Amino acid sequence: MKEKIFIMSGLLGSGIASLFGGWDLALQTLLLCMVVDWFTGGILLPAVFQKSLKSENGALESRAGFKGLCRKGMVLLVVLIAARLDLLMGTRYIRDGVCIGFIANEMVSIMENAGLMGIPLPEMIKKAIDLLKDKETT
């Protein structure tokens, strides 16, 4: 029974990885950044530091967490579509470019979370965060 579960898990995992264009460094890095951002912004900031920007009192809020997970799911759908476009066009750079763009966005969010936790950030990172915040409001 255990062997069947392992086989089915392997088949499912490889099928999903194949849909996303393979289990390469770009996808692994994006998923790692997404998990770190979710953990730091969705768990640590509200639960430990009470400094979440997504809730009124800075604490954990299930609705904010659900919306964040929905956004992460949408990012993965965009990567999936980019991988399919690569297949359609016989290229290899569309999905990688999409992954790199989302990785950069996740990294800025992780740095913002670190700043809210009191970790000193380089001035360049602070300016990048401010620039992205300005874009969100306009």
Please provide the spans of the model-predicted regions.
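Short, strongly hydrophobic alpha-helical membrane anchors
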Residues: M1-F20
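Helix-coil boundary and interhelical linker segments in multi-pass alpha-helical membrane proteins
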Residues: I16-L27, L85-I94
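Juxtamembrane helix-capping/reentrant segments at transmembrane boundaries
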Residues: K51-V75
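Canonical alpha-helical transmembrane segment with a positive-inside/aromatic-interface signature
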Residues: M107-T138
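Alpha-helical transmembrane segments of multi-pass membrane proteins
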Residues: L30-G41, V75, V79-A83, G101-S109
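Mid-chain, well-packed structural core segment of small domains
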Residues: F66-I103
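A cytosolic-side transmembrane-helix exit/cap motif
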Residues: P46-L60, N113-M124
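Hydrophobic alpha-helical transmembrane segments
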Residues: K4-M8, L27, L31, G73, ...
